């Protein structure tokens, strides 16, 4: 039987993997966006685990709001990525300072 601690450890591992992914690869914006999405997944896992443990649905409802914000964040991030690639022919984060306006 899986307990709350198992889910919290899973969430902590996912969160740590996303932080490592952001700090080790600061150049590629696609990897950074994927790491941020993984971080939000870890937070959602903890919300659902606590919600189930406490017998309350508020945590599960909050997950839907987080998923909505994550979808909007991914869409905006990919739009910025497409603009960056069209202007500079690269997806390197260090080249973002060359964009003006």
From Swiss-Prot:
The GO terms describing molecular function are: NADH:ubiquinone reductase (non-electrogenic) activity; quinone binding
Instruction: State the superkingdom.
Output: Bacteria
Q: What is its EC number?
A: 7.1.1.-
Q: Which residues cross the membrane?
A: 4-24, 29-49, 61-81
Signal peptide segment? none
- List UniProt keywords, sorted A-Z: Cell inner membrane, Cell membrane, Membrane, NAD, Quinone, Translocase, Transmembrane, Transmembrane helix, Transport, Ubiquinone
Q: Which NCBIfam families match?
A: PRK05715.1-2, PRK05715.1-3, PRK05715.1-5
**Quaternary assembly:** NDH-1 is composed of 14 different subunits. Subunits NuoA, H, J, K, L, M, N constitute the membrane sector of the complex.
Q: What's the protein name?
A: NADH-quinone oxidoreductase subunit K
Task: List the source organism.
Answer: Burkholderia vietnamiensis (strain G4 / LMG 22486) (Burkholderia cepacia (strain R1808))
Q: What is the lineage of its organism?
A: Bacteria, Pseudomonadati, Pseudomonadota, Betaproteobacteria, Burkholderiales
